[in-house]
């Protein structure tokens, strides 16, 4: 049985790149009828694990990516937190020491730094000569008496090669001489990443280690640990990393200021911030950004649309097909179609996927998803009927690309809507005759007996004919006067949704402001 895993650290957020890696593991397991395991790498004792883990688990649940074993669901191979597996790591370290594949080392950091600098001056690669290695208890006691602290290092081979068969990279050959004697346990006995990861993968019976390419340099030393402990090696597959928008560097949550210079990224972030502000969301500025999954959940993205887009970051079925249901992803996904090159994160394409998916929803589902945002923004109250909301959604059509986009149509619900100052200046304040035309049109609208979209259109067009003007000479001023916006869904649909009383009152208020 195929068993894959995703092993996040409890950082308090779920990174887009991490989710893409988790998705590929999840799909591989699902397709084969295997199991997907969630393991928590929580060896940092200073971190509040429960608080930091919750957003990660919530993110996976929102995405619909269930796990067969791990936090909250348990399983036969637990515990699933590294902080609870100390005995296993200590036993593995002791076996490596006993079998001569590791040693206790008492070098001080500053001594190692001096050796590195000397090697650098001589133009040579630094290779630790093990001069502070304790080969027996007497030597260890001597070093301890000097106030030194002993760590556990791997005793790496100095000759030969490590040959790694990677499902994506092919055959990868690493010269053992290029590997350092890596530290695998601290002086207090607590494990470091390489030891813990190998032991966990073995004891959790992981068959396929599918992870980002940045871990490829770790693989030879992990192979050495596994073979030294007598473990069967898993199958390795190293994915291309997710690159930043318009660039080749790895996507990082720490480079938000840089990404804001990318137009599409900046537009997405600004829109998210607008939704958060209007809906009174309590968001963390450090984690509310498009590099992290929670951003999309907060602003009303569809999880399936996000997963569909992430699937294509490094994978392709035939170079043409882009839209997949979750069932189709599971059916079609194979590792042999994963690219080696990094895939650049494209905010505009992601939004396009979201818009297409949202447009395919039923009217009832769209209303269900949008309603919480409308309530949070104060557009409707809990328990209110949805007539106005449904009318706005019907009129907005594909202009509404995600649930949070309802904030763009605040003018349909409330009178404290935002006003586009540039549009106001251009279409009203500095437009010759706009005030007079609006005043005349308003009297015509007040006299209208029917105010549905079709009748309003007839009324406005008849007014233009009687005034000898083209509709373009009044329609833009009319939109700004009644909505404050430079653009939106159909003008006559907009007027019908607002209703005659609200339309005429807003025109009167606008005229008064132009006096």
Curated annotation (Swiss-Prot):
Assigned EC number: 6.1.1.17
A biological-process GO annotation: glutamyl-tRNA aminoacylation
HAMAP family tied to this protein: Glu_tRNA_synth_type1
Main location: cytoplasm
Family named by the database record: Belongs to the class-I aminoacyl-tRNA synthetase family. Glutamate--tRNA ligase type 1 subfamily.
Ranges spanned by the short sequence motif 'HIGH' region, renumbered to the chain: 8-18
Function: Catalyzes the attachment of glutamate to tRNA(Glu) in a two-step reaction: glutamate is first activated by ATP to form Glu-AMP and then transferred to the acceptor end of tRNA(Glu).
Protein name from the UniProt record: Glutamate--tRNA ligase
Subcellular location: Cytoplasm
PROSITE patterns: AA_TRNA_LIGASE_I
Subunit description: Monomer.
A cellular-component GO term for this protein: cytosol
Annotated motif 'KMSKS' region, positions: 250-254
């Amino acid at each position: 049985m195929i068993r894959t895993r995703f092993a996040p650290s409890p950082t308090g957020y779920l990174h887009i790149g991490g989710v893409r890696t988790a998705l590929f593991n999840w799909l591989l397991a699902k397709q084969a009828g295997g199991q997907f395991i969630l393991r928590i790498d929580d060896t940092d004792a200073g971190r509040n694990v429960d608080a930091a883990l919750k957003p990660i688990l919530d993110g996976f649940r929102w995405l619909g990516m269930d796990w067969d074993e791990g936090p909250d669901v348990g399983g036969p191979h637990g515990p699933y937190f590294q902080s609870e597996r100390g005995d296993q790591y200590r036993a593995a370290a002791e076996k490596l020491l006993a079998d001569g594949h590791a040693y206790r080392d008492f070098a001080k950091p500053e001594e190692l730094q001096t050796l590195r600098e000397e090697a650098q001056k001589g133009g040579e690669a630094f290779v630790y000569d093990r001069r502070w290695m304790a080969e027996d208890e007497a030597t260890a006691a001597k070093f301890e008496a000097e106030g030194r602290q002993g760590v556990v290092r791997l005793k790496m081979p100095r000759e030969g090669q490590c040959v790694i068969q990677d499902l994506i990279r092919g055959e990868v050959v690493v010269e053992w001489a290029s590997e350092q004697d890596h530290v695998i346990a601290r002086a207090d006995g607590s494990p470091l990443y390489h030891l813990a990861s190998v032991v966990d993968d073995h004891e959790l019976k992981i068959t396929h280690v599918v992870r980002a390419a940045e871990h490829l340099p770790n693989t030879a030393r992990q192979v050495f640990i596994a073979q030294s402990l007598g473990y069967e090696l898993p199958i390795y597959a190293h994915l291309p990393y997710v690159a930043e928008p318009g660039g080749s560097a790895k996507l990082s949550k720490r480079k938000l200021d840089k990404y804001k210079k990318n137009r599409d990224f900046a537009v997405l972030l600004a829109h998210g911030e607008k939704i958060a502000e209007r809906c009174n969301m309590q968001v963390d500025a450090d984690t509310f950004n498009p590099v992290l999954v929670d951003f999309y959940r907060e602003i009303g993205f569809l999880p399936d649309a996000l997963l569909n887009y992430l699937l294509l970051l490094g994978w392709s079925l035939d170079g043409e097909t882009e839209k997949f249901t979750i069932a189709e992803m599971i059916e079609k996904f194979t590792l042999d179609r994963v690219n080696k090159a990094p895939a650049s994160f494209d905010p505009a394409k992601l939004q396009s996927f979201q818009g297409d998916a949202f447009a395919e929803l039923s009217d009832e589902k769209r209303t269900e998803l949008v309603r919480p945002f409308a309530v949070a923004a104060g557009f409707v109250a809990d328990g209110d009927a949805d007539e106005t909301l449904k009318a706005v959604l019907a009129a907005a059509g594909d202009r509404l690309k995600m649930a949070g986009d309802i904030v763009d149509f605040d003018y349909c619900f409330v009178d404290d809507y935002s006003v586009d100052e540039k549009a106001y200046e251009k279409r009203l304040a500095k437009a010759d005759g706009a005030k007079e035309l609006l005043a005349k049109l308003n009297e015509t609208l007040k006299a209208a007996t029917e105010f549905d979209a079709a009748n309003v259109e007839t009324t406005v067009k008849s007014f233009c004919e009687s005034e000898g003007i083209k509709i373009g000479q009044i329609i833009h001023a009319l939109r700004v006067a009644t909505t404050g916006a430079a653009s939106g869904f159909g003008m006559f649909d907009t007027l019908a949704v607002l209703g005659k009383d609200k339309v005429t009152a807003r025109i009167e208020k606008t005229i008064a402001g132009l006096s």
